[in-house]
Amino acid sequence: MSFNFCLPNLSFRSSCSSRPCVPSSCCGTTLPGACNIPASVGSCNWFCEGSFNGNEKETMQFLNDRLASYLEKVRQLERENAELERRILERSQQQEPLVCPNYQSYFRTIEELQQKILCGKSENARLVVQIDNAKLASDDFRTKYETEVSLRQLVEADLNGLRRILDELTLCKSDLEARVESLKEELICLKQNHEQEVNTLRSQLGDRLNVEVDAAPTVDLNHVLNETRAQYEALVETNRRDVEEWYIRQTEELNKQVVSSSEQLQSCQAEIIELRRTVNALEVELQAQHNLRDSLENTLTETEARYSCQLNQVQSLIVSVESQLAEIRSDLERQNQEYQVLLDVRARLECEINTYRGLLDSEDCKLPCNPCATTNTCGKPIGPCISNPCVSRTRCGPCNTFVH
């Protein structure tokens, strides 16, 4: 914005003491524009020498000074406006455009690390499953070992019971054998006593007496003993067979019970192992799901933190840009206000200049001479002032001044 005013006549007349006279219609009023120009500017006090009084000179000097101050202020505002435009241009050129940082490499690294973490977690889960399977196998073998140990203990208990029975049978056999031996000894003693008695009787009777007695035939003790032995042996054999049959039946029943119990135990153990495997598999899956959830929560937390940081950066950038925009808007509003003020000042100055120009042009025809000038605007010589302003003189057509 520039104000180029061409005021040759005004500058020329401000350098001398002459001043045009304002028409009588302007007397007692102020000139256009909010400059509060004194009303004495329009007073038409004319002296025959063409000079003005001191009040009019001071008013003219005041107006010229105000015009010069306005022009100086306009130039200063133009310089400030140019400086502000230059600063805005430099700032707009220096300010780098907003470029979002490229995080693709970091994202790729994060994805690779996440893949490695997932692979490690799957490998750990596989190893955990293998360890659990080994534990289950060891538990199975331990259960089988305990089962075999319990079966061995049962068989040993049965053997101990059978040994006790065998010992009892052995004792019973020994008792029976002792009884047989005692009976044999008693039989031998009886035979010896009988023979002694028979011999004694024979020796007493001699040959004199031959008594025949119809008596029952004598019993063969050997035969009786043999029969008794046979009976006892048959009884022992019968008892032994009965005991063996009872032992076999008890053993078979126990074996059946042990087999059924072992089958039930194996089925229960298999079911328990299957349930343990299922529980372990479910626990492993649950642990994997927990790990996946923790990983996803950590990823979500990291993503939220990263995006919150980016959001804070963007918000701070937005706040900075908004502050810069507000500053630019305030500068623009201030410059607009200054521009409006300058436009008003320009309008007032143009109005005043036009008024001054009209006044000067209207008064050029009334001035007899200019004591400070020797030529007019056309370059023609101006005649000297005369004391009688009523004498007719020749005027210059283009500039409307008197010549001689």
UniProtKB/Swiss-Prot annotation:
User: Which residues does the UniProt record annotate as the domain IF rod?
Assistant: 56-367
Q: Could you tell me the keywords of this UniProt record? A: Coiled coil, Intermediate filament, Keratin
Statement: the UniProt record of this protein carries the keyword Coiled coil: yes
One GO biological process term: epithelial cell differentiation
Map out region (Coil 2) in residue numbers: 220-363
Highest taxon, organism lineage: Eukaryota
Q: Which Gene Ontology molecular function entries are recorded, alphabetically?
A: structural molecule activity
Instruction: Offer one Pfam family short name for this entry.
Output: Filament
Q: Where is this region: Tail?
A: 364-404
> Matching InterPro entries, A to Z?
IF_conserved (IPR018039), IF_rod_dom (IPR039008), Keratin_I (IPR002957)
Region annotation Head: residue ranges?
A: 1-56
Coiled-coil region: none
Query: What PROSITE patterns would the database entry show?
Result: IF_ROD_1, IF_ROD_2
Annotated region (Linker 1), positions in chain = 92-102
Q: Spell out the residue ranges making up region: Coil 1B.
A: 103-203
SMART domains, A to Z: Filament
- Mention any one GO cellular component term assigned to this protein in its UniProt record: intermediate filament
Q: What does this protein do?
A: Wool microfibrillar keratin.
* Record's miscellaneous remark: There are two types of cytoskeletal and microfibrillar keratin: I (acidic; 40-55 kDa) and II (neutral to basic; 56-70 kDa).
| Name listed for the protein in its UniProt record | Keratin, type I microfibrillar, 47.6 kDa
Q: Which organism is it from?
A: Ovis aries (Sheep)
